[in-house]
Amino acid sequence: GSSAAIRTGGYQLFPKPMGLRATGDSKLAYEVARAIARQMKSAGINWLHSPVLDINSNPDNPSINTRAYSDRVEEVIEYARQTCIGFKEGKLIAAAKHFPGDGGSGRDGHYGITVVHFDKETILNREIQPYRVLIKEGLLPSIMSCHVLYPALDEEYVGTLSKRILTGILREELGFEGVITTDSMTMGA
């Protein structure tokens, strides 16, 4: 077989979120999610850190880029919704990421702290909007935080360490009652 088949143990590789969005068919995101759920279940995996809910606010972002569905909030919501439904029906636990958003950063958080200088209104109405909608729809059993510093929300702590962000916004304002996980704590950020 091909080297891709060897690296993936024979599992099918699928397009990144931006590739799915480029098809213009959100139902394809659902079908891909169902297929991913089948593959993960066959390997004994029941929890996946996906989908990426980041808005591609900075197309030069080196770590998000094609991992984002779109630079348009409504498209991110629709494609992520279909992905979450596919995972849920396939009995795969989704952990949406990277709360409160990493699509506006300009560097890869694996190598250092990323600071996003959006104002609070922009963060709440654009970056966090997919979480707000999908939490309300009951599609997010788990959310992964990110190590981005948002001075408009918390001048001192990155999202992962911020009580203002995780408790104040995610739990209290958005009403999230599920499991919060974190991105790798050994990243450069």
What are these model-derived regions, one by one?
Residues 11-15, 47-69, 94-116, 157:
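Short glycine/serine-rich loop/turn segments
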Residues 17-30, 63-74, 116-119, 154-156:
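Second-shell loop/turn segments in exported
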Residues 17, 36, 64, 89, ...:
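Alpha-helical hydrophobic/aromatic positions enriched in membrane-embedded helices and signal peptides
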Residues 1-12, 29-56, 76-101:
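Glycine-rich, aromatic-flanked loop segments that form ligand/cofactor-binding clefts
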Residues 75-189:
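Second-shell residues forming the walls of enzyme active-site clefts
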